[in-house]
Structure formats: C-alpha cells, structure tokens
C-alpha cells in the first residue's frame, strides 16, 4: 500500500494534482494504471469515465478541480450506485452525472472532450468505440486488461492515432495505458500490435515483450496440439511474430545496455 501510494503521488504530482482527499480510497480500489490515467487528464477537461465502477477516478478529478464536469457510466446498476455514494461522500454530486448504459450509448458527443475506458478487455473497448465514431474528435485514455494487441491494430486501422503509451505494473502482469486521438496512422506489424508502438523508451518494455512472447508461445503450443486444419499456417504466423519480438527486444537491450 505504501509503495502504491508513493507511485500515485509521483504520477499525480507530475501532473500538478494534489495527492490528498479521496486518494486513500482511490488507491485501495485501483491499481497503478488508474492512477496514471488520472495524471493524463487535461486541466479543465470534461470527462466521460466508461465502466466507472466505484467512481473514484471522476470523483477524485472533480474534488481537486482537475476537470470541470464528469460523466460516470456503467452498464450495471450496482456499481453506478456505488459511484453515486462516492460522489456524495466527497461532496461533488453537482459536478457529476450518472448514466446507466452500455459504453457511450447514453452520452452525447458534446458532453465530453476526454473519454476514459479502463479495466475491460480490448475487444469490448473496440465495440464501444465502433458504436461511438465521434470519439475520433476526442482524447481517449485507454487501459485494456486483455487483448491490447487487438485494440492497437483496430485503432490504427480505423482513424485513430496512438499518441502515447506507458506500462504500469499490476498484481500479476504489466498493463499498457494508451492515449489516442483521431488521425491517420501507418499500418503496424503483428509484433508492433503485441509490444506497442510508443513503448521503446519505457523501462519496463523488455519485461513486457517477454510476457508477450510467452503468451504467443503458449498459443502456438496449443494450436500445434489441436486438430485444426489450418494449424500449421497459424503456428508459423505466431512463431514469426515471436521472432520479430525477439529482434526488437535485442535492439532495445543494445540501446539500453
């Protein structure tokens, strides 16, 4: 807890966000990824927090006047009620609206200039963004729990630019936090989708690549043992991706040795 609190304060101090008030609850209920997301929110933003859970992030940002208003949305009623109670406990109910909806379905484009989607799988994030093409005109702060490679590939192929990535350590693995806006991107390779397009200077990148390679190796082993007709082609594709990741890691180590 103390290590987490120190990291939280470091993130938030860099962004000139005071580290007090709801921070104790905030760190108890959220990991480094969410704390880093808070530091990325522009001063004076209007925020939509999709899948808000207990509402710690929008409440914290409102309490310290980082944002002018916030929308907390969730597909389930119970977490949204938790968010209401959090907002009431910290006296920010006037600055926050609550929406019971899937993704951004009940949020109008003019209501937010910054959209935060965190704590869900990359495939779910893709579906949310598909249903809200107006997000190309917004700042996106994204933290996929799984399938980050699918999210990266989809973003660059559908009118978004990944502008920044940062790795944060969760309980058992590393997670990527991405920022994205609308724009044209160059196509990325499968290896880039797995290891990130803006992570070469991250001190945790080598470890992240190792995690990705291990995941791909397990997938290749599973395919090899399967009875799928196209397994050889798919295994070859996975192994080629692993080889490219190994090359990228070697270049990274040479540059950081």
Language model features with spans:
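S-adenosyl-L-methionine
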Residues: 1-18, 24-43, 59, 73, 77-110
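Conserved SAM-binding motif I beta-strand of class I
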Residues: 49, 69-74
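Class I SAM-dependent methyltransferase "Motif I" SAM/SAH-binding loop
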Residues: 27-28, 51-55
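Conserved S-adenosyl-L-methionine
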Residues: 63-69
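Short SAM/SAH-binding signature in class I
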Residues: 112-119
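Class I S-adenosyl-L-methionine
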Residues: 2-9, 105, 111, 123-257
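Short glycine-rich anion-binding loops that position phosphate/pyrophosphate groups of nucleotides
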Residues: 53, 120-123
